């Protein structure tokens, strides 16, 4: 798979293009007197060093771009790499099956769990089918149906958050978008099973929170979590979306800042160059964190679990 490089990654892209060119020449003519292998290796080492340098000093806006990267792994990618025996469940039993939310029963190291997550698309048709990862009310009602099923069968709930926000269309509002989100917030706060939430890309406003109330809340290193997009904030405060980089810095949308504010528990490191550069390695790190979180929560009684979750919610806003 050829990589898509963002604007701030162009120096890396130029090096990678040189590497690809030399590699192609070497394959076409193995009788060349010049030892291209050594040059290719030198350029690869230089590319790694340059990538480390660039990614060591990323701003909030650059992280936001990475969180939206078109090749970034989505919920179904992590399900494929981390879980076994996934059986997808569909529909809210009231209106429709919202493809922007996927969910179902699977096994994590042999243990039954309920998985729920936002799902974006990659190709144009798939993006439209998934509504660009923006759920309607029926999506959140489907999620709640699966959570209640998990509680009934004593299965831990694992959610993956990756959405620009809940769908703001007229139809969604008419069908009770705000009510669906509010109901999820209320019900998730009292479910009597462990809930682990992980922001894997964009964590946009109430659309993210609707599956984001948990006993453990994690973020991938280059994911974001905010009440509004940087562009939306800039449009309100400065009347121009061009101020999005400034808004991103001011909003504190990145994982280290949110951990500092005690809004999340863990920042999960990503492979060099972000998650899409090495999906299996990213999935392995995420799996290890999920297992560690489950081990911690398994030691709590139902009452302790609920009390801890309640205190967590009440402490939001206090540093």
Swiss-Prot record:
It holds the Pfam family ACCA. Its EC number is 2.1.3.15. Residues 35-296 form the CoA carboxyltransferase C-terminal domain. GO terms for cellular component: acetyl-CoA carboxylase complex. It catalyses: N(6)-carboxybiotinyl-L-lysyl-[protein] + acetyl-CoA = N(6)-biotinyl-L-lysyl-[protein] + malonyl-CoA. Keywords: ATP-binding, Cytoplasm, Fatty acid biosynthesis, Fatty acid metabolism, Lipid biosynthesis, Lipid metabolism, Nucleotide-binding, Transferase. Pathway: Lipid metabolism; malonyl-CoA biosynthesis; malonyl-CoA from acetyl-CoA: step 1/1. Gene3D superfamilies: 2-enoyl-CoA Hydratase, Chain A, domain 1. One of its GO terms (molecular function) is carboxyl- or carbamoyltransferase activity. It is found in: Cytoplasm. It is an enzyme of class 2 (transferase). One of its GO terms (biological process) is fatty acid biosynthetic process. Its main location: cytoplasm. Belongs to the AccA family. Acetyl-CoA carboxylase is a heterohexamer composed of biotin carboxyl carrier protein (AccB), biotin carboxylase (AccC) and two subunits each of ACCase subunit alpha (AccA) and ACCase subunit beta (AccD). Component of the acetyl coenzyme A carboxylase (ACC) complex. First, biotin carboxylase catalyzes the carboxylation of biotin on its carrier protein (BCCP) and then the CO(2) group is transferred by the carboxyltransferase to acetyl-CoA to form malonyl-CoA. This is Acetyl-coenzyme A carboxylase carboxyl transferase subunit alpha. It comes from Pectobacterium carotovorum subsp. carotovorum (strain PC1). The lineage of its organism: Bacteria, Pseudomonadati, Pseudomonadota, Gammaproteobacteria, Enterobacterales. The gene is accA.
């Amino acid at each position: 798979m050829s990589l898509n490089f963002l604007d701030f990654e162009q120096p890396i892209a130029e090096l990678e293009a040189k590497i690809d060119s030399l590699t192609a020449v070497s394959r076409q003519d193995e009788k060349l007197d010049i030892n291209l292998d050594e040059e290719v290796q030198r350029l690869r080492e230089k590319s790694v060093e340059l990538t480390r340098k660039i990614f060591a000093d990323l701003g909030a806006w650059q992280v936001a771009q990475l969180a939206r990267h078109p090749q970034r792994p989505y919920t179904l990618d992590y399900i494929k790499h981390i879980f076994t025996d996934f059986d997808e469940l569909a529909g809210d039993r009231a209106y429709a099956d919202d493809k922007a939310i996927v969910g179902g029963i699977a096994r994590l190291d042999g243990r039954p769990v309920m998985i729920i997550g936002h799902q974006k698309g990659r190709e144009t048709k798939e993006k439209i089918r998934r509504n660009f990862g923006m759920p309607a009310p029926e999506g959140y009602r489907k999620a709640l149906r699966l959570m209640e099923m998990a509680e009934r069968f004593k299965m831990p709930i694992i959610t993956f958050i990756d959405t620009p926000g809940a769908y703001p269309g007229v139809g969604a509002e008419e069908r009770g978008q705000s009510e669906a989100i509010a109901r999820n917030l209320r019900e998730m706060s009292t479910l009597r099973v462990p809930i682990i939430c992980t922001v894997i890309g964009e964590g946009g406003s109430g659309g993210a929170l609707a599956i984001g109330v948990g006993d453990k809340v994690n973020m991938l290193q280059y994911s974001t979590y905010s009440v509004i997009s940087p562009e939306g904030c800039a449009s309100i405060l400065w009347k121009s979306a061009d101020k999005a980089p400034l808004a991103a810095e001011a909003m504190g949308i990145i994982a280290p800042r949110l951990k500092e504010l005690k809004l999340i528990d863990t920042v999960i490191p990503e492979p060099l160059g972000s998650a899409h550069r090495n999906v299996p390695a990213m999935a392995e790190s995420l799996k290890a964190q999920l297992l560690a979180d489950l081990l911690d929560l398994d030691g709590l009684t139902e009452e302790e679990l609920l009390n801890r979750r309640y205190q967590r919610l009440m402490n939001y806003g206090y540093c």
